Amino acid sequence: MKQESSFLAKLANGSLVLQILVGIIAGVSLASFSHEAAKQVAFLGSLFVGALKAIAPILVFILVASSIANQKKNTQTNMRPIVVLYLFGTFAAALTAVLLSMMFPTNLVLVAGVEGTSPPQGIGEVINTLLFKLVDNPVNALMTGNYIGILAWGVGLGLALHHASDSTKQVFADVSHGISQMVRFIIRLAPIGIFGLVAATFAETGFAAIAGYAKLLAVLLGAMAIIALIVNPLIVYVKIKRNPYPLVIRCLRESGVTAFFTRSSAANIPVNMALCEKLKLHEDTYSVSIPLGATINMGGAAITITVLTLAAAHTLGIQVDLLTALLLSVVAAVSACGASGVAGGSLLLIPLACSLFGISNDVAMQVVAVGFIIGVIQDAAETALNSSTDVIFTAAACEAAENKAKLG
């Protein structure tokens, strides 16, 4: 009995990743044993995701305002190289998806379109939505989780407080520290939350509905795996000139796993912030780059848009030449960066990409419906790739800047 309690104590105080793994196994086991019991624990997952989503907006706002207000003069934040990495990574993801889709063309079994959804009419509408999110009411931005608006107001307040008294700056620093402590507590509850999420997912879908889309999923997940395990490490190696895999694997393990099950980049912002702190990155940098990455670093979304659009074109017998495929890569990358400005995210940007090939809106919405069917896996993998890449690129840019400073 004493040995058993000792094992439980070790498990409770041990590795969070190990605890999450236990939660996943327990969730799958419960769903296999009893669907009804699994549905009863779904609220644990909802509570966990709800807590992360609730604290993320105020965390981003206070952390950004505090870090900018307390920033020392002549401090390098390395934001430009990080933004370049985000944009290049998203384009590389779209290009990889094009190549894989051409190597393994997929036919879709089109279903009825999704009711009550209205995709944007063009890239102009996506950009217009993003611009208006930028000047959203700050209280509304915090309430609705509009991270573009939160970032804008956080940066504005931080700049305004830059010349404030030291005591005012210290208040913001203390509040920021307090919220970070709350985030650490919520993250410790991840195994319980993921147990509920996994149990509910297996109980509700059983993954039988998505078995018919195995080839499409193989292309989607294959492209995401290539980006996560080959392209991203290659980009990181170019930046830091050393073996990138320890960093990449750690980010996939500590950020990607949580993001996979929460299926929310916003909910994973506190997890990424905590990981950046563990990696000893500059707070002035990651407090801005992580929420910005959750908004514009959308490699997974670019893959989803590209693969489903080319699958639709192949199903309809439309020949896609190399130039059009390259144009699709650009459109998918730009659209993906605006995915946070569209209700429904990457899936509702598919009609925009389909319009390149003259595919009607009715057919495009049927493709969106296919996306919703495979969404349990597609959305989870997409979020895991997007969110873990935020930390990978931030860490790579910070290390590259440190190496340059040492040499200089």
Curated annotation (Swiss-Prot):
The keyword Transmembrane helix applies. It catalyses: L-serine(in) + Na(+)(in) = L-serine(out) + Na(+)(out); L-threonine(in) + Na(+)(in) = L-threonine(out) + Na(+)(out). Coiled coil: none annotated. GO terms for cellular component: plasma membrane. GO terms for molecular function: neutral L-amino acid:sodium symporter activity. It is found in: Cell inner membrane. It comes from the Bacteria. Keywords: Amino-acid transport, Cell inner membrane, Cell membrane, Membrane, Symport, Transmembrane, Transmembrane helix, Transport. The chain crosses the membrane at residues 11-31, 43-63, 82-102, 141-161, 192-212, 216-236, 298-318, 339-359, 363-383. One of its GO terms (biological process) is serine transport. It is a multi-pass membrane protein. Its main location: membrane. PANTHER family: PROTON/GLUTAMATE-ASPARTATE SYMPORTER (PTHR42865), SERINE_THREONINE TRANSPORTER SSTT (PTHR42865:SF8). Involved in the import of serine and threonine into the cell, with the concomitant import of sodium (symport system). Belongs to the dicarboxylate/amino acid:cation symporter (DAACS) (TC 2.A.23) family. This is Serine/threonine transporter SstT. It comes from Shewanella sp. (strain MR-7). The gene is sstT.
